[in-house]
Amino acid sequence: MNNTNDLYNRWLAQPDLDDAVKAELVSIAGDADAVTDRFYRDLEFGTGGLRGVIGAGTNRMNLYTVRKATQGLADYLNASGLPKKVAIAHDSRHNGALFARETARVLAANGITACMYPRLEPTPALSWAVRYLGCGAGVCVTASHNPAKYNGYKVYGADGCQITLEAAEKILAAIEKIDCFDDVRLADFDAAAAAGRIVTIDEKCLDDFVQAVYDQRVGDGAGIDALKLVYTPLNGTGLECVKKLLKKLGVTHVTVVPEQEKPDGDFPTCPYPNPEIREAMQKGLELCDKVRPDLLLGTDPDCDRCGTAVPDGKGGYRLITGNEMGIILLDYICRTRLAQGTMPADPVAVTTIVSTDMAAPVAKKYGVELRRTLTGFKFIGEQIGKLEAEGRPERYIFGFEESYGYLSGGHVRDKDAVNATLLVCEAAAWYAQQGKTLLDAIEALYRKFGYYRNALCSFAFEGESGMHTMQELMKKLRANAPEDIAGYKVESVVDYDTDGTGLPRANVLEYHLDGGHKLMVRPSGTEPKIKVYLSAVGDSEAAADAVNAALAKAAADMMKA
């Protein structure tokens, strides 16, 4: 049965259908486009799990799609020989607690112990719990920094990383055999809890997570107690763990943005709660004008990304980009560990193919091996796992990606904004001891290594036709590689969807241009959009910015269907 109207009618005819789902289905009766959009496909399950708009239908996040995915996960676990235990967390999004509870019910009905945090917690705390509790998998109900209408379902492996492509394919194969109404086993929550099949994660687990982050300190902490901070959790999960960490560090001058302090799935002050964008940080910046802190820190709803602003020397505050902070922290960690004699032999730093090329000369200066992975922090986590398997986990010193994700230890296997808070505070305090800010730090690095400018252009393609348009655009780009982009000769093209790159195949095109500039095209794995990453380098800020502006215009032209 694949006719959208048939699916719609079958859903509507279900006895005991969830009230909210039923009301939505009734409201779209006779609206062919609305019915088609909800039923023309199943939500795609991949290495990022599920992510979609909350609502009714097979192409939405709801009780039934979550239960179906969990039944597939349970079937996979029961056939795999992995521990029959799963850690579960959720963030502040709508239906987060409900979806986490339904996940636990399905797992319990399949003989798998569900370990649930008693309240909303950060994604890195979920990665920690998987390893800490010896679980076979983990589930985090989150849509990260997407708008309020979204929710998601991230699956983690026993190593605390988001699942590999191989695991995702096996889970998907199991999911595809399941009818969301007829084939899902479902336990009574209270009965399963009484039987020990659903358990609450002990507070010690979270306390030990915060301690593990604290143990990632790089320097001696001199001057850190003098730091003055403004912090915003963007109505998400970060407040508890970040405040606990700051207290351990001795950072007591902390002002929390009041409108964004409490969890709120509507994200009323910022429709797109992403610390990468100014709009999300605007309330924090306004508070900075009154409080005049040394740092503004913002974490996204599931507290795995961290944004920063610092005084600009002109009475205002400047946002530091994810690439800039990655370079600042890489340089700080390397110079500090060398000075203190704590740098391991054969140190390794890891970044992604869409992150700044500036990492290469910085790593080279300090004798650090730089590894590049595909987009997604799970690939950085995999590199930590490889070093661990070799018996040399201490070689890993830092990993970052351009989208504001950082990690300096192996305590978790995903980006960690609590860890980022520690590193940013340490680096800011170290520079403050010299009368400098983090802005001074990145400017000095630009002067030394060149002015690297990176930008991200996103092009949305909504609905069923949008997915087709995205596929056709990528096909066209592969068939007809441009000879030049923005007037810069295309010197080479790397298609990551082929063998020979040294990385797993991925739907990414990379154009290397004359002058050391670069443009990369990548369809998002979680949203209906194509992302174009721009990279320019020049001997001045103005020169690099001019190239980036030209590349941005060229990218827009390339995306026209």
Residue ranges and their predicted role:
Residues 156-187, 323-347, 351-362, 417:
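Glycine-rich phosphate-binding loop plus the immediately following alpha-helix
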Residues 289, 293-295, 316-318, 336-522, ...:
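Phosphate-binding and adjacent anionic-ligand microenvironments
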Residues 87-150, 247-308:
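N-terminal small/polar loop signature for handling phosphorylated ligands or for N-terminal nucleophile
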Residues 97-102, 127-131, 149-155, 176, ...:
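Short acidic, glycine/serine/threonine-rich loops at helix termini
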Residues 16, 34-39, 43, 151-280, ...:
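Gly/Ser/Thr-enriched, mixed-charge loops and adjacent short helices
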Residues 2-103, 110, 193, 198-226, ...:
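An N-terminal, well-structured beta->alpha segment
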Residues 39-59, 143-144, 233-241, 245, ...:
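Conserved phosphate/anionic-ligand binding catalytic regions in large, soluble enzymes, centered on
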